[in-house]
Structures are given as C-alpha cells and as structure tokens.
A protein has these predicted regions:
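Conserved, mostly hydrophobic/aromatic
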Residues: 10, 94, 132
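C-terminal domain-boundary segment and adjacent tail
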Residues: 38-41, 109-151
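Histidine/acidic-residue-rich catalytic or RNA/ligand-binding cores of hydrolases
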Residues: 49-55, 76-78, 102-111, 151
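Glycine-rich, flexible loop/turn motifs
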Residues: 64-67, 118
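Aromatic-lined glycan-binding groove of carbohydrate-active enzymes
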Residues: 37, 51-58, 83-104, 138-140
Length: 151
C-alpha cells in the first residue's frame, strides 16, 4: 500500500465504523479500493446495527469471516477442544487475547485472568497443533481472504 505495509484486512475496533451508515460506507469503500477483507460483526449481532452490513459487503465481493468464536472467561484446554470440534464449516474467526501476567495487565483490564489463560493455552500447550489437525481445521488468517479477493 502507500507506505509499503502488507495490510491483510480492515478492522474497525469494537465495530466503531459499523454503527452509522455513513461511517460504514467509507469502511466498505476502502475495502473495495484496496481489495481487503473486512472484520465485520457476526450475523447474530447484525440486527443491532440496523442495516445489513454483511449483505452490503457481500454484494461488493468483499470477504469477511462467516462467524466468530471465543473461549469462556477463563478457558481450559478441554473448553478449547470442545470449541474447535463444535465449529461449523466455513471461516470462523477465533478471538483470543493472550497476555503475560504483569502488574500493568492487572491494572488496565478486569479480564486479565482470561488473557493469561489464553496465553498459557497458546504458548505452553505443545499438543495444540495435533488437536487442531484432529478437528479437521485449516488455520488461515485474513491474508488468505485478501489473496482470494485479489485473484
């Protein structure tokens, strides 16, 4: 892109650009101009916005995740395995917030225990690759969606 960054997707953190049609128009136009997928809210949450953001994006050929999944507050390995085995076909964005337990983390967020739990699961669990493979999951990122849009 302009400064040489290899941007994989656009993300309006906390769905800020999805709350008003005039903001979403700009978000969607950028996705179309640069052939970038969007991080959109789930189909279940879309009625809260008041206009069909997912359909508008799809009509323009802009890709996005089919659904979202996250672990409960403080997840366990078994909860993660259950979540993986319960995924439906399609593209699911798995949202985790791994963080190392520090005084700063504890000061800035009330969900620090869940973030530390996510970190332990992702970093310390050496068998996670096998669990993912056994569940029949192909791990991709938004770059894969971007490349599909560009070809």
């Amino acid at each position: 892109m302009l400064w040489g960054f290899d941007i994989s997707h656009l993300d309006a953190h906390l769905d800020a650009l999805l709350l008003r049609p005039e903001f979403f128009d700009v978000y969607l136009e950028l996705a179309m101009e640069f052939a970038l997928p969007l991080r959109l809210l789930s189909a279940e949450a879309e009625p809260n916005v008041g206009f069909p953001v997912r359909k508008l994006a799809a009509d323009e050929g802009v890709l996005y995740a089919d659904r979202f999944a996250t672990l409960p507050a403080v997840g366990t390995r078994q909860a993660f395995i259950d979540l993986l085995h319960g995924l439906e076909p399609g593209v699911t964005e798995l949202t985790l917030h791994p963080a190392i337990d520090t005084a700063e983390l504890r000061a800035i967020t009330t969900d620090w225990q869940a973030r530390v739990s996510d970190h332990v699961l992702l970093v310390d669990d050496r068998g996670l690759d096998q669990v993912i493979e056994k569940a029949g999951i192909t791990v991709i990122g938004y770059r894969t969606l971007r490349d599909a849009m560009r070809h």
